[in-house]
Amino acid sequence: TETEMMRYIKRLDRKDISLAHSMIPLGSCTMKLNAAAEMLPLSRPEFMCMHPLVPEDQAEGYRMLIENLSEELKTITGFAGVSLQPNSGAAGEYTGLRVIRSYLESIGQGHRNKILIPASAHGTNPASAIKAGFVTVTCACDGQGNVDMEDLRAKAEENKEDLAALMITYPSTHGIFETEIVEICNIIHACGAQVYMDGANMNAQVGLTNPGFIGADVCHLNLHKTFASPHGGGGPGVGPICVAEHLVPFLPGHGLFGNPMNEVSSAPYGSAGILPITYGYICMMSTEGLTMATKAAILNANYLAACLKDTYGIVYRGANGFVGHEMILECRKIHEETGISENDIAKRLMDYGYHAPTLSFPVHGTLMIEPTESESLWELDNFITVMQTIWKEIQEVKNGEADKDDNVLVNAPHPEYEVVGDNWEHCYTREKAAYPIESVRENKFWINVARVDNTLGDRKLLSTRYGTF
């Protein structure tokens, strides 16, 4: 019955933490608010009942929205052309590289097959480059997390004749603004190659700078990050690419329009159903609002960094002592001194009602945190309180006040069925496990399962088919 279906969906909802409960601090994911007003078009049949291959004269309004959104994205990125076809950020990377290849072939440079990728670039870059048929060359970073300029110059010169492009993320995945970004672009262009800017961290650029101004040739955007469409359980993503004037002729076409060059989606405008959300976000925010959002995102990240630097420590800071829109929290020393790992800290955060941050990426043994502009001062302060309380729990282990093999960290998370069960054999109280601070008492989110073996779970998928709801 519909009633059963409704209750089934609600049961699933209760198992899943979301922004409706607390901040999701996943670094490099930009888990910002998906405002209800932006989502309104999803309930309108004029948008949702439109077939991707509908005749053009029956989709004039939708085409107008697509054209207007494309103009907005060109203005934001400082580029001359846009394709909305790619269905994810990684698909955008792949598409951008295909565009670069087509351009190079058009000027008799099709032999160029190497992509230079700094160690601080976004994680999908090497895979996208290889998928697009290129060979990757890694460029080192210095001790401050910046691209090592000497190594960059050496690698660029060494591969000068075969270099197709540099893929670089700005701000970098280390959470800092590369001070030499313009010079980096100049070095690559001097080799006859193109600059691909990964837009994963565009939330720290909008309104303050843009890839075109910096000197890039192509970038992709993540509408599900910077531009507020939902991540939605791993999708749906939209990863449009924006390109400089000389690359516009090589943007993806579509067989429907008689030009399948660089086509990457079966639908001419990709996941077009998502576009009204982003269009609504941009129109409601306006230029001033988008710029303020960028400033607030950077401010929030630096506020967290300032409050956590004396306990955990921040791995990388920019030349001015600040981070970008995210930070990497140092946990390696904690593990050396106490045996408590970044994994233990991440799982303990679940007991406090928070989604775990990004774990051991891009630096092993660390946590990457991105608060976005959407979080209030109260939420930031509560998260700081939680992290400092966990720090105290770590110190209890370090000082011998808590058993190193049986404590709230190594046993986290603590689901309800475990806390209320008849047998409780831990050295600490049920209250310490489940209700460590007052804010948790007021807004408890119960995790569904106790600790699982991450590696075993990743390597051995066990699927279950349910006969009924």
What do these predicted ranges mean?
Residues 236-305, 309:
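Mobile "lid/hinge" segments at catalytic clefts and subdomain interfaces of large enzymes
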Residues 86, 141, 168-171, 329-331, ...:
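Short glycine-centered, acidic/aromatic-flanked micro-motifs in structured strand/loop junctions
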Residues 61-64, 91-260, 340:
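Conserved PLP-enzyme active-site core in the AAT-like
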Residues 17-38, 85-96, 227-242, 270-274, ...:
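Conserved phosphate/anionic-ligand binding catalytic regions in large, soluble enzymes, centered on
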Residues 83, 137-139, 357:
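General small-molecule cofactor/ligand-binding pocket signal
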Residues 128-130, 268-273, 358-361:
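A glycine-rich, aromatic-flanked flexible loop/lid motif
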Residues 1-81, 98, 118, 149, ...:
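Non-catalytic terminal extensions of PLP-dependent enzymes
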